[in-house]
Amino acid sequence: MVELKPMEMGEILDGGLTLYRRHFGLLIRLGVIALWLPASINIYLQVTGGALQHSVLYVIVALLQYFCGLFLTAGAIRIISDSYLGKETALADAVGLGASKIIPLFGVGLGKGLLLGLLVVVIGMLAGVGVPLMSGSGVAGLLFFAVVFIGAIWLLAFVACGYAVTTQVVVLEPLDGAFDSFGRSWELTKGFKRKVANIAILAGIIFNIPVGVVSGLAQGLAVSNPGLSAVLAVVAALLPIVLTPLLACVFTLMYYDLRIRREAFDLQVLSQQLVSS
């Protein structure tokens, strides 16, 4: 059981890596169960011409991987949460919970995507209309537009950080409805959105750099070294099995850190332990 206490950003990342290493075998088995089919199809796509040659299949497997990723994320959150609270979780428990949370997580993800997508569209329209208008207004006009545009980007990041732990809320808390996770996540992140942003950026780098580098090398070597390119394409297709649980580890610890800071969750757990003993 990890010590229940408020954590700094480095402690959350280090704790996430520690839990990931501790349960690596269980998380990988869950990852294989969740992603073996989309990973296999992705490998086939990569070695037979890629998305341009199989556009319809590419879209289908992308959707399949998304839903399987929801299953994997929910199951991994269960494993990490139980470990953090000093409990043991069997693979069957993680699989059962993961399967039961696919639809709620899809609904929440769709709602979040629509909201953030709408903000992106508004920012794009602002840029498309504002640049021509302000270009004739001199330096003052351009500076004003720059301030407004930066403010819009800040708003997008602020909203995204406010809803950063909706997934953990859906998986770990009893809710009347999945969309209650939006208000709950916003409440937990109140006052800590900069910290959430920093952790999300670092976690995103940890996840995306290996995938991006391996995928880029595979594409770059497609002509000069097809054999090595095929091997790298296989590795790129398998990386989500390894890396998706790592993201779940980091964000789950961040969720508990927010609960400890906002709700004294550590004292709640301690009182329950004292009562049970």
Placement of each model-derived feature along the sequence:
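Nonpolar helix-loop interface/hinge motif
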Residues: M1-G50, E88-L91, I153-A230, A236, ...
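Membrane-interface segments at transmembrane-helix boundaries
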Residues: M1-R22, F67-L143, A160-R194, C249-S277
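Membrane-anchoring/interfacial helices and their immediately flanking loops
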Residues: S40-I60, G136-V147
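Membrane-embedded or membrane-proximal helical elements that form or frame transporter/channel pores
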Residues: L52-F71, L238-L239
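Alpha-helical transmembrane segments and their immediate juxtamembrane interface regions
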Residues: L63-Q65, L143-V165, S229-Y256
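Hydrophobic core of alpha-helical transmembrane segments in multi-pass integral membrane proteins
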Residues: I123-M125, V148-I153, G216
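Membrane-interfacial helix-loop-helix connectors in multipass membrane proteins
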Residues: V129-V148, A218-V235
